[in-house]
Structure formats: structure tokens, C-alpha cells
Amino acid sequence: MKLFRCVLILLYAATAYGLAQSQSSPKKQLLVIGEEKGYRHASISHAISVIEQLGKQKGLWDTTIRTDTEPLTKKKLEYNARNLTNFDAVLFFTGGDLEMDPQQKADLLSFVHDDGKGFIGVHSAAITFTRWPEFVEMVGGTFDEHPWGTFDAPILVEDPKFPGMSQWGKSFVLRDEIYQMKLFSRDKVHVLMSLDRGKLDLSNPKVHRADHDFAVTWAKMYGKGRVYYSTLGHPEENWNDPRLQQMYAEAIQWAMGLVGPDLTRIEAQVK
């Protein structure tokens, strides 16, 4: 009987501990903005759906989807609408100059830089606010060209230990549209993937980078916050690829601070 009582006590204690843990660790909140001004990417709707499902499957984050910029502010909104203060990270699958007033822009930068929250940029996020220097600085670069269009891109994995990289192997080929970046320097970011320049047609007249450095995916710090960008995700079918799904799922977790590594040292080196 004493043994039975001890077992019951242990079971109740374990249950109480589990409940306390779940109550003290609520799911993170992800805001996804899927708005474009100008060119429309057909893959956005499916991509956002995949991102939402990944959050549900892993039980780590809830996804709020918007096709406007109203939540990108810290001011109180009408009708109990949610704003940046309700989120742990923002994901942009966007394009063009979105409608944001100066205060909204300042709030978005502060959300990452000062509040230590996360920002994830997908593909055409690099064609967003190309003339807003602070946004370009936060992301780590901006669109210049896509010299080879959608092609069988030869990609090297530069840091296989970073979250979301190991499943790709050391190198791989993926049919996607890879952007050439300007206002980009690998000295200011942690490059995770790049094009294998030895397998590219560098005589293409749209190749503008003299260093032939074509980063595909990178991570960086912006103040206290974490920023992740990848040009992958142009074709809709790529969002059905488990490797791409895992990459973005772990990118979101990293940006939210759920997993390492801490890249603060990179920002310190830049300063």
C-alpha cells in the first residue's frame, strides 16, 4: 500500500510539473506578411499555408497571416487588433514598397533591433523597400538581378551545423530563382548557402558582382534581434520539398531564439 501511495504521489507530481512547464512556456507568435506591390509571386499563398502548418505540426508557434501592414506598429489598434507587441517574430514574403508610415517603419526596426525579436525574409523580401536604407541594412542586402532566372542552381552549404542546413548535405542542385544581391557583404552576415561559382555562367551580362559572391541564405544579428534571409522559395512546388520545409521551420525557431547559435559576435566584429 505504501508503495502504491508513493507511485501515485510521483505520478501527480510529474503531471503537475508537466502542466507547470506547459503553462510557463506558451507557444511563440509569428506574424506573416504576404503583400506585394508590383510583381506577384504565385507561390506566396501556398508558402504561407505551409509555414502555418509547420507551426501547428511542431506545436511551437501560432501563425497570424496578413496581406496588409496594419499590424506593423506598436501603437494600440482599434477593435482589439494585434500589433507588433503581440509577436515574437515577423516573416516577410513580400515585394515592392509596402504602405507603411514613418512611425511604422521605426517600430518595425525597433521590434528587432531593440526588443530582440526575430525577422525572417523569404525570397522576394529582398525586393521589398529597396530604397529604405535601414531596412536593407537589417536584412543584409537587397535585390540587384537574377542573372540566370529560374534554373538548376548549384548550391554549396557553408555551415552544415546551423539549424535547417544538415538535410541538404554539403552541396545540392535545386531548381529555383536565385537573386544576385547588392549592398551585401559576407563580412556583415553569417552565410549559410551560396552558389557554386565554378558551375555558373559568369559571362552572363546580368552578372554585376565583381567578386562573384552569390549568397543564397544567411543569418545575422540586428541589434538584439535575429534576422534570417533566403532567396529560396520562388517555385510553388519547392514548398512541398521536406528539405525546404525543414529549413524554414528551423529558421523560424532560430529567429525566435528557441535554438542557437548566438551570432552576436558577428555584429561586434562589424562595429
Regions found by a protein language model. Give the residues of each.
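Catalytic beta-strand/loop cores that center a nucleophilic Ser/Cys/Thr
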Residues: 62-64, 141, 149-223
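Positively charged n-region of N-terminal signal peptides that target proteins for export
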Residues: 1-5
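Helical hinge/lid and interdomain linker segments adjacent to catalytic or ligand-binding clefts
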Residues: 31-33, 38-121, 125-127
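Boundary at the C-terminal end of the N-terminal hydrophobic targeting segment
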Residues: 18-22
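A glycine-rich, often tryptophan-bearing local segment used as a flexible ligand/cofactor-contacting loop or short
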Residues: 97-170
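Bacterial N-terminal signal peptides
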Residues: 6-16
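Extracellular ligand-binding/catalytic regions of CAZymes and related secreted enzymes
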Residues: 24-28, 42-45, 49-58, 67, ...
